[in-house]
Amino acid sequence: MRTYLDLLQHILDNGGDKGDRTGTGTRSVFGHQMRFDLSQGFPLLTTKKVHFRSIVIELLWFLKGDTNVQYLKDHKVSIWDEWATAEQTARFGRPEGELGPVYGHQWRNFGATQNSDGSYKNDGFDQIKWLINEIKTNPNSRRLIVSGWNPNEAGQVALPPCHTLFQFFVQDGKLSCQLYQRSADVFLGVPFNIASYALLTHMIAQVCGLGVGDFVWTGGDTHLYANHFEQAQLQLTREPLPLCQLKLNPEITDLFDFKFEDIEIVDYQSHPAIKAPVAV
């Protein structure tokens, strides 16, 4: 994944330093694109170890339409904990652990009616179910889009969706996906996002009877936090290793039937993990 290392170097060399919401400070560029041929290996970063289990559990959580971190906690995944504290959720009148209309809600219940207690009726638009049906019945459509960004609700959550919109494209029996990410934490977040959407593309391709094409990552405000510069420079000293392979249970024909046990990576080699603080 040399293209990812090239992005780190590009930001360090050419980015502009600016303040940010968290008070940490960033070095940022605006508008960047990376392309990964999914037939040539699974794009899980090798220049530092990435916790694939957390990526899988989070994606399954999104697909459930869930917005409470209890499912993540039950599976020992802590990547959303900073935004699920009592202090954070109380800002929006929600109990600890309830994140509100984040990814799962937008994907599976977009535009739902809010109840007086802050919960939502199940009367919104299920974008994922619609997408699967559309890929199967109208694969040449240019409207194979899922949006995680609802302007009416973006201000009702501690962390509005960073990966905001994704589109699929079918050609020659292969499924490709492009993600637009409005805000891209390149050191911590982007490696997860690349792997998550690559995994989603494989899963949807399987249930739609398609092969896989490309995953295209497009970033808006593409940044390194100021307290990640040293870690990025360390990562740039490491040589990429061969990509691993993804194995899915071939018996699964419904996207919502996938469980953790149905998803496996094979021959993952990586350099050691590099720790870095999360900006909240």
From Swiss-Prot:
Role, per record: Catalyzes the reductive methylation of 2'-deoxyuridine-5'-monophosphate (dUMP) to 2'-deoxythymidine-5'-monophosphate (dTMP) while utilizing 5,10-methylenetetrahydrofolate (mTHF) as the methyl donor and reductant in the reaction, yielding dihydrofolate (DHF) as a by-product. This enzymatic reaction provides an intracellular de novo source of dTMP, an essential precursor for DNA biosynthesis.
Say which family it is in: Belongs to the thymidylate synthase family. Bacterial-type ThyA subfamily.
Swiss-Prot/TrEMBL keywords: Cytoplasm, Methyltransferase, Nucleotide biosynthesis, Transferase
The GO cellular component terms are: cytosol
Pathway(s) where this gene product acts: Pyrimidine metabolism; dTTP biosynthesis
Source organism (scientific name):
Acinetobacter baylyi (strain ATCC 33305 / BD413 / ADP1)
Enzyme Commission designation? 2.1.1.45
Q: Which GO terms describe its biological process?
A: dTMP biosynthetic process; dTTP biosynthetic process; methylation
Please give the name of this protein: Thymidylate synthase
